[in-house]
Amino acid sequence: MENLFEKLMEQIKMPPNLRRSSQFEHADIENVEVHTASKLWHFQLIFDEILPIDTYKLLTELTETAFSTIARTEISVSSRNQNIDEQNLNDYYQYALTLPELCDSAFSSIFKKYHLEKEEEKIHLMVEDNPQMDFFVEKYFPILEEKFKSFGFGEVRITPLVDQELTETQAAAHAEKVAARLAAQTAEQAQISEIKKQRSEERESKNTREAKPEFVETALSDGIFFGRKISGQSPITSMSFIAGEGFGVIFEGLVFEAAHREFTGKESGKVNHILELKMADETSTFMISKWGRKDEEIAQFDQIVSTVKAMNEKIIADRTDGEDNFTDSLSDALWLRVQGNIEHDKYKDDLVLTANAVVEIKPKPTIDRVALQIKAVKSDKIQLGREIKNNEPVTPMRSVSEFSTNGPVVFEGYVFKGELREIKSRKTGNISYLLEFEMTDYTSSFYVQKWLRGEEEIQLAKQIKAGLWCRVRGNVQRDNFKNDLVLQLTDLIEIPTQNVREDKSDEKRVEFHAHTNMSQMDAIPSASSLVAQAAKWGHKAIAITDHGGLQSFPEAHSAGKKNGVKIIYGVEANLVEDKIPIVYNETDVDMYESTYVVFDVETTGLSAVHNDLIQIAATKMHKGNPIDEFDEFINPGYRLSEFTTELTGITDDHVKNAKPLYEVLTKFQKFCEGTILVAHNATFDVGFMNMNYSRNGLPIITQPVVDTLEFARNLYPEMKRFGLGQLTKKFQIGLEHHHMANFDAEATGRLLFVFLEELRTRNTGWTSLLELNDKLVSEDSYKKVRPKHVTLYAKTQEGLKNLFKIVSFGNVKYYAGLPRVPRSVLEANREGLLVGSACEIGEVFDAAINKTFEETLEIAKFYDFIEVFPPALYRSLVVGGSFKSEKELEQTLKDLIKIGKTLGKPVLATGNLHYLNPEDAIYREIIVRSLGLGAEINWTQGHGEHAKPLPLPEAHFRTTDEMLEAFSFLDEKTAREIVIDNTQKMADEFDVLTPVRDDLYTPKMVFDGGETSEERIVRLTYEKAHEWYGNPLPDIIDARLEKELRSILGNGFSVVYIISQELVKRSNDRGYIVGSRGSVGSSLVATMIGITEVNPLAPHYRCPECQYFECYDDGSFGSGYDMPDKNCPKCDHKLIKDGHDIPFETFLGFKGDKVPDIDLNFSGDDQPLAHLDVRDIFGEDYAFRAGTIGTVAEKTAFGFVKGYERDYDQFYGNAEIDRLAAGSTGVKRTTGQHPGGIIVIPNYMDVYDFSPVQFPADDVNAEWQTTHFDFHAIHDNILKLDILGHDDPTMIRKLQSLSGIVPQDIPMDDPGVMKLFTGTESLGLTEEQLGVKLGTLGIPEMGTFTSMNMIAEAKPKNFADLLQISGLSHGTDVWSGNAQDLIRSGIADLSSVIGCRDDIMVYLIHKGLENGLAFTIMERVRKGMWNKIPAEEREKYVEAMREHDVPEWYIESCSKIKYMFPKAHAAAYIMMALRVAYFKVHHPILYYCAWFSIRATAFDIGVMGAGLEAVKAKMKEIKDKGFDATNVETNLYTTLELCNEMLERGFTFGKIDLYRSEATEFVIDGDTLIPPFVTMDGLGENVAKQIVAARAEGEFLSKMELRKRGGVSQTIIENMTNMGVLEGMPDDNQLSLFDDFF
């Protein structure tokens, strides 16, 4: 038999010498417990003897290492002979103190100096005398004993025994320490006295010592006196000078907190008393403790507590009365002189003076300074533990590692995440509180933890939340669970916000270029934070200029109103020319007969102004043949950069003896005479040539220039990349040394003639050079070029609408990789706009570094103002080589300012901000780098493997002073003009605009005969009401309809109702039932016109024959469906039961003016048609999908941080990763559309009155356009229809088709159906067969694990109870910890607890509360506001409820609720559920066919068809996996539950049938269901439909034919064969060999 222990030893690589030793001779494995969920393996081993400690530790370490990739490990040891060696015993003892369960500093630091002694069968722990020993024994000794058991010592009992020798030794050591401390204090006293002098207001001169007040010590009868007397002449120590332990220290001070505590020793049973005080002197505060040794001392403890309590009550009373004279409030305070030893209290983790003498002192000294100390302690400033002095050294978090700290450290920083955790002990049930938060000092971040002791600490901890700045002290330890370093907190004190930047300038600038987090993957701040910062600095306005979009406008608008800041609405758009020419300086010449000079230049950088030519090379060609060459290097006058040489291959040796520039230029001009110039990306080469010609007094290029880049783009639009390398590769043209001008020029020439020949091949007949631009340039040529940035700002409301149009055109008509704005579109919609020159990608800046001053001047005329940034924002251009120095950059900015002044256009210094503060730069860095090198923003320097990211600029929000400093290279007047004066003047030119309207705008509808929506709703309402309830109507119905119609018509809501009615009617006409969501079922008008089936009237009977009406509005029935069946007393016809008692106020509010939100559940099959119905009703220009914005979520941001850490060689702790991820969230990543939301534009307006438009996720092939704004932003201003898809209507439609039963005829109180909610009887099955207690599996809303548990506990009996179940299961904090507890305790039953929101209003009205008050209470409760409203308001509601006998449990239940479900929504759900359940009970095979066709999402058709045993085995397999089961397995388990139920009821599954199976739906064959094709693994819906379509064309003669006609893969064919689907079918049809002959 295999020795498992030996196998384990081999696996963990235990050294052979140990494995063969006597220690392991008879060792064995008794048991191995594998905890799958927690990934823990627990080995239980047995040995002959207790192992030596070193062997035991090696065993545990090797096991842990060997299994580290699989699971955590634990080892428990037992020994057959428990011979205890005292040395080994103590070795294990010291080892135990290092284990996590016992390494608490308060315990291990004291007990590690003790030792164990064995006395016969007893084991004693030799300890010193310690008053806290009972506490330690009770808390830690059971753990210690359990550990020794796991070490192999068996059941041991460890008892403490006081070691007198040790006690004396410790006392002597302590005395030595105190003596040293007193010696040090001698030197301190002079310093203390000097500081006291300085603080004394009464001193006359620096050298005059304050007279010490005479204190009178009083006897016990006259005051407080414990222990020996304290001499009035003894030196008094200031509390602030205590830094460590000390002996014989005396304090004098005021007692401001006191507590008398008692505890009973577990061993002795003795009651111990301790007095705990907090005292203050004029320098600080301190904790004092005094153990009660005598009865008379203990008696005075309560006297002290009483005195201090009275003082604190006076302080509170004075402040309540509006007084805050803190010093006067201390007039009756208790003053003490105390003497004792200062020790570090491990339990409190602080220094405490343990007093041996206490004396009350009178008269009291001046208390002003002491009052300040107490006030600081009692102020709003948060403090946990001891004070941390300002002069204590603060450690940067980045410098802390696991091995760099020894002892406490102090951090200072910002809390960015925190929680107070309540932890319940599994063993004892005791609740402990753990404070956990994360903080950063922006060098790194740290986890901080503290176990809280006492209510005071818990209450303080609740205030430690994100946003707090604090100083903390504690010890750094590694937390294995968090896998990071954690500061174990001892002390915390709130500090003022650090590093706050202020705008101290008397006059403030206005920022005109600001990005929010709606600049896609490029900026960090929300619009709210941006505007709040501007307001904080006193800026009167700020401009929003996101990239290509306006999605931050609604938030900015709200923030502007809130903060009193004018919002200037703008955008940084992508400007393109309408058509990009192929030929510049075009003339009418024959392009096939002309001579061409194909040239290329190499330069030292990208700027024609600041970089130099180093090579000009050209090939002169005629009819495709080279006829001459030109190749000259040029000496720039300085050494070439490494980057230039790397890119071009040109070295200093190439250029050092080259000809002068002027000579080369004149020679080249002569070479080019009478030719057409050709270049690839000609604007670059021509720009450099013209700049150098101009500088050297030579004429610029005027002959035609052909750009082969644009030639290729227009000739081969299907290509994606048009670089010279890609093109030469495609056309097999040699390019040996790319980026050397001579080789590039020759390759470009050969490409030109390839293109000309292509034109000839296409028989275009074009010969003139003019025809290239006129006929070849595509209308879409703008799509391929790199756009130039331009900033657009709306000055007026008309301008804002034009801005909406421009952005819409860019996102819809001209979208190509990003939204583009053709210049013609901008010019056509320029009214009301200002146009700025934008950034370094703008054409003005581009011209300034690449063109002559005159050319730049001409380009700048298009703009209304010129923008310049601080030099730091152009950093990438300097690093990338466009500028050789900062001076060149500064000169360019001066040139731009000069251009502005020359043209009379204002120049504005703007910040191009992308984040708020300098420390936020890392967040943008992470976001931008996540895009990958070469992305639009993530520019690189170099190519291929040498490519490196260029640095991102310092793009924080700058104060006025910071901006002025950035432009300090200008004269002071100019700097002030562009930073302050011009920005303020321009801000004043803008109107106050409103991008989001205040009112609701609905379309106007006119029907046949001129009937308006208002007239139609009235007509339809009363037609149905009279049909159901007679004419005249009963008063209660007439009043209800009149009230509702008054609200609907008066607020313009009729069109909302009528649109919904029309959509429901159209879906009904197509054979589908429509379910309602939300509170629309609260409206009787909605019921009457057919929007919802839910009837909100009180439970009632009505007669369909004679309209008899009988109503129960006293609350005696929760639903009309629960009333007994009854015949009409007038005509004896069976009465219809209806009504759920739902107030109208829950839909449109108490005043009836809340915008109606009608959500409808259409069948998923019919939803697309319902969407198109809206477009059909209103027109394509007035119906849009509701837009959504997808932002970077926390998990995605976490991935970005980890990617950045990997790609850029960083290392972050987990807390720092949390911070960086949190800072990177919320940035716009994509756009989308609401799954069912349709926005309807009024037909008397257009969409640009409300929002720009775009395609969802920039998909230009999408069927619908969406609103550009997130639909929530315009929800209250425009009609939104929620046309949602749901499975329930699809199920009902399927069941109706199968059965012919009309859904409305199904009773809502069928007894068999109701029994499903109490057991399995209706199914004819037992609980054991089914595996669950109820029959609700597969019933909508009622078949989940959670809902079934709730049903089983709540025991619903009728429809009203099911409404409660629906409300309880959808609410938050309504069931768990609330209604559940009430039902369990018998205080209330299901019918009386709060289930749905409407129940509160109805219940309170029935109790007698006024309707308005009942409504208000309901609103406060349902929104979770009960505990957030002011206490006085809440108390008013509670009083009113108590006055009307509302039970206390009901009031308490209200206080716990966070969210509540509407009753109308619950009613609609339950009606659908009961209809489905009816088929499950009475037509089971139809039900299962529908359920598996529509609801099931995962299949294992092999198991399902294999019978009950196979199904149950598979269910057990998945269940045993627990949380390790995959999502697919979890979904499959749900399918198998219904499969098991179906099989148990006697039905079966057949196998897939090639000629009978459908694509997606099951087919009924007697008591058998034939599965559809999609139930096969790997066979999708499209292929399934193709098989069915091919089958309709004729029989499949072979598997090969099935593959071809059905589009089926070979893998699927093999699976079908294995499943027997293709039984008897040959692999190939022999006749097919001759198909080609027919």
Swiss-Prot record:
UniProt-listed Enzyme Commission number(s): 2.7.7.7
GO molecular function: 3'-5' exonuclease activity; DNA binding; DNA-directed DNA polymerase activity
CDD domains xrefs: DEDDh (cd06127), PHP_PolIIIA_POLC (cd07435), polC_OBF (cd04484)
GO cellular component: cytoplasm
One protein family per Pfam: DNA_pol3_a_NI
Domain Exonuclease: 596-752
Reactions listed under catalytic activity: DNA(n) + a 2'-deoxyribonucleoside 5'-triphosphate = DNA(n+1) + diphosphate
Region of interest (Disordered), residue spans: 193-212
SMART domains: EXOIII, POLIIIAc
Top-tier EC class: transferase
Domain of life: Bacteria
Alphabetical keyword list: Cytoplasm, DNA replication, DNA-directed DNA polymerase, Exonuclease, Hydrolase, Nuclease, Nucleotidyltransferase, Transferase
SUPFAM superfamilies per record: Nucleic acid-binding proteins, Ribonuclease H-like
Family according to the record: Belongs to the DNA polymerase type-C family. PolC subfamily.
Known function: Required for replicative DNA synthesis. This DNA polymerase also exhibits 3' to 5' exonuclease activity.
Name of the protein described by the UniProt record: DNA polymerase III PolC-type
